């Protein structure tokens, strides 16, 4: 058993179905087919620990008022040997279930037994999943969108790993195409300017300080060696140097941010291997392309897109769409991923339907591709929005953010809201060492527990075997609420993995910290009666395990002292 909440839900389903069949046998209910029993956590505590609207779902089939069905089912239930303490019928026909103390005791035993593996579930059954995220243009430093995408993608990968998937983290290097051409022309202009030659950064080129820095470094290494060579040769050397340095810098910054990739995949490699041209040929052979205005178009409207798009420009150069289709075919066919997840900025939403359509055209199930779209980031300081601009060079970079607030706060804050919600990142709040700062609040809970453990160990209090601890003594409301929240950790992992919702873990860990602080502010651990002290010791050890495991998923430090 890895998910005790799931076990309780299964018991409820079983009890409900047996009661339903018993009621039919006795002629109290009449129906032909049975709907699925959905068991959910109610929003209000007074509505029990778990609930089902099954009676409402069955009302039409049974030709009876849902409340009456619920009452009949409840009257026929046999809950002995289960985690169910009592059953109540509420409202128009909800059946609410309250869990017994055995559920609480088994939860704590399970956490102590599984330790650092508590929360892991086997949802994925070892399936190969790839999470591709950040994939920033290697033409300059990483910005706030990349910072948010990094936090979302990396935590998502950790959640999927916890959920039993075989996960690969990937960075797609956009080292081919139009922006690389502009990058080359921008570097060339700066290099020539440094040599005293009149040159201008082209329209739509890169004007940032980083471009000047790269040109200066190149000049220091090569001097005026490239002054009089043909422009194409000069740009090729500058691009090669600039990309190498920028990618090295990206890797350094991402490691500081807690992100290490399994694969760095080059777009250019898809051209070198011929995969881009092969996929264009395949789509053409299957009848999914046509020529218009000298260009080759992909019939995307066949797959639900609003309009067709160009695969090969009239000058014979493939578009970004063509290389991206080849890239996704490489993920599914060449490398055999069962599931591919891309974390993209919301401005790429128009690219989702074409990509899924292209997969369908290639005979790949488009449901194996998921795209998490994330909204924009606003940085707030002193109540004012801090503006940022990539092209003017006055941009706040990922490294600036890490230096300003630290890795922990950055990763935590970016995962506090769902990816599809815009985020206002309060720099002042992220630096506060107070309970107003959610990351401090959670870390303080962990440090506080470590402090209590040290004090208890100094007194000689220890738990040799959890079976010898009288966990039935934990009956106070704050204790019960806390244990029930701990029970939900594997369920949170399951839901977060199914719905690609990394913010669930951040919210969950805040809830655990809040319930722990409430418990500790109301009840003594040290100084309680001996058996109760041991039971509470077992409880706070379980809280520490869950906080540490959840913070590890977020790659946020769990400090032992603060």
Curated annotation (Swiss-Prot):
Its EC number is 6.1.1.19. It comes from the Bacteria. Gene3D superfamilies: Arginyl tRNA synthetase N-terminal domain, HUPs, Isoleucyl-tRNA Synthetase, Domain 1. It is an enzyme of class 6 (ligase). GO terms for biological process: arginyl-tRNA aminoacylation. Keywords: Aminoacyl-tRNA synthetase, ATP-binding, Cytoplasm, Ligase, Nucleotide-binding, Protein biosynthesis. InterPro entries: aa-tRNA-synth_I_CS, Arg-tRNA-ligase, Arg-tRNA-synth_N, Arg-tRNA-synth_N_sf, ArgRS_core, DALR_anticod-bd, Rossmann-like_a/b/a_fold, tRNAsynth_Ia_anticodon-bd. GO terms for molecular function: arginine-tRNA ligase activity; ATP binding. It is found in: Cytoplasm. GO terms for cellular component: cytoplasm. Its main location: cytoplasm. Coiled coil: none annotated. A motif ('HIGH' region) lies at residues 136-146. It catalyses: tRNA(Arg) + L-arginine + ATP = L-arginyl-tRNA(Arg) + AMP + diphosphate. PANTHER family: ARGININE--TRNA LIGASE, CYTOPLASMIC, ARGINYL-TRNA SYNTHETASE. Belongs to the class-I aminoacyl-tRNA synthetase family. Monomer. This is Arginine--tRNA ligase. It comes from Caldanaerobacter subterraneus subsp. tengcongensis (strain DSM 15242 / JCM 11007 / NBRC 100824 / MB4) (Thermoanaerobacter tengcongensis). The lineage of its organism: Bacteria, Bacillati, Bacillota, Clostridia, Thermoanaerobacterales. The gene is argS.
């Amino acid at each position: 058993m890895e998910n005790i909440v799931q076990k309780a839900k299964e018991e409820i389903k079983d009890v409900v179905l047996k009661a339903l069949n018993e009621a039919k046998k006795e002629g109290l209910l009449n129906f032909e087919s049975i709907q699925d029993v959905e068991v959910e956590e109610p929003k209000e505590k007074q509505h029990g620990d778990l609930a089902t609207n099954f009676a409402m779902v069955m009302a039409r089939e049974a030709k009876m008022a849902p409340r009456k069905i619920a009452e009949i089912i409840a009257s026929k239930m046999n809950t002995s040997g289960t985690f169910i303490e009592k059953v109540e019928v509420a409202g128009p026909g909800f059946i609410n279930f309250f869990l017994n103390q055995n559920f609480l005791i088994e939860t704590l035993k399970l956490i102590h037994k599984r330790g650092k593996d508590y929360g892991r579930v086997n949802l994925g059954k070892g399936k190969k999943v790839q999470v591709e995220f950040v994939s920033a243009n290697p033409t300059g430093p990483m910005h706030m969108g990349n910072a948010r995408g990094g936090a979302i993608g990396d935590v998502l990968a950790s959640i999927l790993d916890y959920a039993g998937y075989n996960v690969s983290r990937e960075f797609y290097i956009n080292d081919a195409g139009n922006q690389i051409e502009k990058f080359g022309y921008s570097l060339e202009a700066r290099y020539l300017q440094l040599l005293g030659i009149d040159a201008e950064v082209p329209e739509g080129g890169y004007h940032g300080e980083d471009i000047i820095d790269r040109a200066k470094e190149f000049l220091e290494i090569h001097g005026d060696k490239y002054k009089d060579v043909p422009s194409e040769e000069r740009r090729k050397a500058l691009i090669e140097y600039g990309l190498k340095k920028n990618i090295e810098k990206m890797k350094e910054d991402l490691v500081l941010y807690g992100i290490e990739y399994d694969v760095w995949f080059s777009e250019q490699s898809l051209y070198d291997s011929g995969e881009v041209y092969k996929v264009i040929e395949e789509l053409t052979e299957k009848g999914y392309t046509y020529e218009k205005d000298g260009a080759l178009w992909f019939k995307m409207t066949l797959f639900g897109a609003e309009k067709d798009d160009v695969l090969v420009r009239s000058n014979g150069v493939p578009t970004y769409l063509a290389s991206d289709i080849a890239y996704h075919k490489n993920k599914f066919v060449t490398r055999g991923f069962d599931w591919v997840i891309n974390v993209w900025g919301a401005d790429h939403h128009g690219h989702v339907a074409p990509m899924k359509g292209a997969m369908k055209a290639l005979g790949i199930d488009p449901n194996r591709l998921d795209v998490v779209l994330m909204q924009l980031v606003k940085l707030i300081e002193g109540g004012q929005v801090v503006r940022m601009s990539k092209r003017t060079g006055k941009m706040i970079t990922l490294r600036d953010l890490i230096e300003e607030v630290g890795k922990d706060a950055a990763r935590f804050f970016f995962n506090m809201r769902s990816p599809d919600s815009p985020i206002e990142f309060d720099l002042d709040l992220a630096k506060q060492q107070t309970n107003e700062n959610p990351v401090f609040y959670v870390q303080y809970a962990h440090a506080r527990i470590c402090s209590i453990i040290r004090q208890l160990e100094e007194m000689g209090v220890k738990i040799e075997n959890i079976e010898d601890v009288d966990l039935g003594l934990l009956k106070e409301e704050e204790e019960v609420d806390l244990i029930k929240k701990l029970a939900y950790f594997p369920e949170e992992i399951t839901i977060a993995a199914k719905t690609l919702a990394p913010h669930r873990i951040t919210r969950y860990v805040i809830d655990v910290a809040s319930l722990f602080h409430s418990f500790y502010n109301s009840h003594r651990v040290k100084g309680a009666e001996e058996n109760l002290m041991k039971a509470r010791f077992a409880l706070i050890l379980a809280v520490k395990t869950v906080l540490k495991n959840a913070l590890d998923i977020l790659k946020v430090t769990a400090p032992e002292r603060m």
